[in-house]
Amino acid sequence: MHLDGTTSFITGAAHGIGLGIARSLARQGSRLALADLDRPALGAAAAELAELTQVEAFELDVRDRDAYARVADEAEARLGPVSVLCNNAGIAFSEVLDDTTYRLWDLVLGINLGGVVNGVQTFLPRMLDRGAPAHIVNTASAAGLIGAGVGCMYTTSKFAVVGLSESLRHQLGTAGHPVGVTVLCPGGVSTNLARTARSLVGAEPGVGARVERTAPQIEAMLQRHGADPGAVGDQVVDAIRNDRLYVLTDRAGIDLVTRRTDAILAAMPADGRTDAGLDDLRRAAREVP
């Protein structure tokens, strides 16, 4: 997909990976609609990127479907039809089992999964109506491929984003639509994601104090060992241009991915249906009235 002259809509665009993606898209000649909750950082990002391309900035909570639709309308009125959607907004914080309250489940799933769903539901129908080449990038995590080492709320949300992306790409491809889907599964990236969680979980008993205590340590570790957001942005742009499904930023989890895959393969019966049988089932499911 060619990016020069397109319009890109990016959530979580004021910091980290989102800003890295925005910079990379701007260098390719794409106009930018930047969405984020952090108004000061959003303004700074817009001012920086306006040196490269046409930019509009929107304060947006991705959980708010009505607001999402209004912002989408305004962005397209100012910048033209959105053909690249980057569902990047997310929340992460240090989890322990005592944190698994309904309130926090709703918060994590609402942002990390609901924000992606709301982006897809808002923009995909517009993309399909136009019938022109388009692309959707959903930010998941390496934790969406490995069910170990990270809290269950975050991991659940990211596994869901991977599954959504794989299924959506398959459905769009089967139907012949010119809309690609990429799922970004970053490992450690040099961002302030831990710090941005403070405003959302700071008042939660136990969690807020722990986030305040651990955020500086997590950020220092990511600064030392994490991937550069600009390099991640370049990977995403390359995936859009070449219609790649997966983007991974490092090989740190390769042993865990291998063990998980091996365990799944070992759990399969020695005999029974193979891919041909699954193809029959998929075909039958599509033909159900």
Please identify what each model-predicted range represents.
Residues 171-248:
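SDR active-site lid
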Residues 96-97, 101-106:
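Substrate-binding pocket helix/loop in short-chain dehydrogenase/reductase
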Residues 120, 157:
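Active-site helix of classical SDR
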Residues 39-40, 58-70, 102:
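The beta1-alpha1 cofactor-binding region of Rossmann-like NAD(H)/NADP(H)-dependent oxidoreductases
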Residues 28-45:
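Conserved glycine-rich Rossmann-like NAD(P)H-binding loop of the short-chain dehydrogenase/reductase
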